[in-house]
């Protein structure tokens, strides 16, 4: 029992630490798109911060507010996205690299999701799911 509690605590704290600092700004039902909701979040990356591989239960549009991010979807080459630029991810994309391109400056993203109501926007992936 104690081992299970320790495992769950470590897994929970590890998952939260693996995606940058996420701040939810808004969630809103989309009445013209039954069963869907829109969500807006910011994600702050400390200098050199790397997120764990993940996917999203959503179509998402990502605008880089500050700094630069190196991003790579499974099957694609890495790309560097700078402040003022936008990229897109589909629900089937596996995001294998997401990291702040700078070791000295923070980076900040503004993320717009369109997703099924009630589903978590982000799913962290284990080794076998990448």
Stretch-by-stretch model annotation:
Residues 50-52, 70, 87, 91-100:
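Histidine-centered metal-chelating micro-motifs
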Residues 35-40, 59, 76, 92, ...:
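Extracytoplasmic
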Residues 26-59:
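N-terminal targeting signals for Sec/Tat export/insertion, comprising classic cleavable signal peptides
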Residues 58-75, 83-85:
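Glycine- and acidic-residue-biased ligand/ion/polar-headgroup-sensing regions
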Residues 30-34, 45, 75-92:
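Short acidic-glycine-tyrosine-enriched beta hairpin
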Residues 8-17:
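Hydrophobic h-region of N-terminal signal peptides that target proteins for export
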Residues 1-7:
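Sec-dependent signal peptide recognition
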Residues 22-24, 29, 33-36, 100-130:
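Double-stranded beta-helix
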């Amino acid at each position: 029992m104690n081992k299970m509690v320790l495992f769950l605590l470590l897994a929970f704290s590890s998952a939260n630490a693996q995606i940058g600092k996420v701040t939810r700004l808004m969630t809103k039902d989309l009445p013209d798109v039954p069963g869907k909701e829109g969500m807006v979040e910011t994600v702050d990356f400390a200098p050199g911060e790397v997120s764990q591989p993940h996917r999203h239960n959503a179509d998402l549009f990502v605008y880089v507010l500050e700094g630069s991010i190196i991003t790579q979807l499974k099957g694609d080459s890495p790309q560097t996205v700078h402040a003022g630029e936008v990229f897109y991810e589909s629900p089937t994309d596996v995001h294998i690299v997401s990291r702040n391109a700078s070791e000295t400056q923070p980076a900040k993203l503004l993320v717009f999701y369109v997703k099924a109501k009630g589903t978590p926007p982000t799913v962290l992936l284990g080794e076998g799911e990448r």
